[in-house]
Amino acid sequence: PLPCRRCGRTRAEAIPPEIAAYEQFHDIDRNAWSYDGIQYCVARGLMSGTDTHTFLPGGVTTRAQLVQVLYHLAGDPDMTGVTTPFTDLTSDWYQAAVAWAYKTGVVDGTSPTTFSPSRPVTREQAAVLLMRYAARLPGFAGSDAPADLSAFADGGSVSGWARAGMADAVALGLFGGTQDTGGRVWLRPGESATRAEIAAVLARFGRNVAHLL
């Protein structure tokens, strides 16, 4: 099978809206909290399976995968002839996406010459990339009232460079917290974002921010 442009593994066809994700992927529970987001993303071709019948909702999302999704949101612009300084881009499926994201300022390298395509994306990193992408949309001016991150038990652990992006993302309803048995709500900014979490965030992004998706 051909390598998937979105996940780098095996191409799974984007399913039309009338076909339920749980019918296509054997590891999707239609009663799961993440089902709506997964259905939204696969029906629009924003995300696909890791193989024909597997979505892997609990798997991590890599930098290459998230950049590829944003590239699709941007309409897959032609990046022929556009280069990057990164020497670790070893797979063809994400080359154009990385070039686009780097050129537009949506993403930076992990060093002047490395992109680290296989590195898992953290929740705060995903928030920043989404807000950078949103800043390119006509008329988008961010949140009128960025969220108070101190409301989260771990709000103080959000990296300084990510605080503005995360505060906007929370205010726009893209990210929320997880409540423990003691009633404290955790944002988990440094944890790797799962594929299910990214699907949910992308669905919220499409509905709350990029209304034309």
What are these regions (language model features)?
Residues P1-C4, I38-C41, A101:
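Extracellular/surface recognition and adhesion modules
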Residues R11-Y35, S48-A96, T104-E124, R132-R163, ...:
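Feature responds to low-complexity, polar/acidic, surface-exposed segments characteristic
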